[in-house]
């Protein structure tokens, strides 16, 4: 998901 990719 987009949220998981942003939480790097």
From Swiss-Prot:
Keywords: Chloroplast, Plastid, Thylakoid. One of its GO terms (cellular component) is chloroplast thylakoid. Disulfide bonds: none annotated. Signal peptide: none annotated. It comes from the Eukaryota. It is found in: Plastid, Chloroplast thylakoid. Its main location: plastid. Transmembrane segments: none annotated. On the 2D-gel the determined pI of this protein is: 6.7, its MW is: 16.8 kDa. This is Unknown protein from spot 105 of 2D-PAGE of thylakoid. It comes from Pisum sativum. The lineage of its organism: Eukaryota, Viridiplantae, Streptophyta, Embryophyta, Tracheophyta.
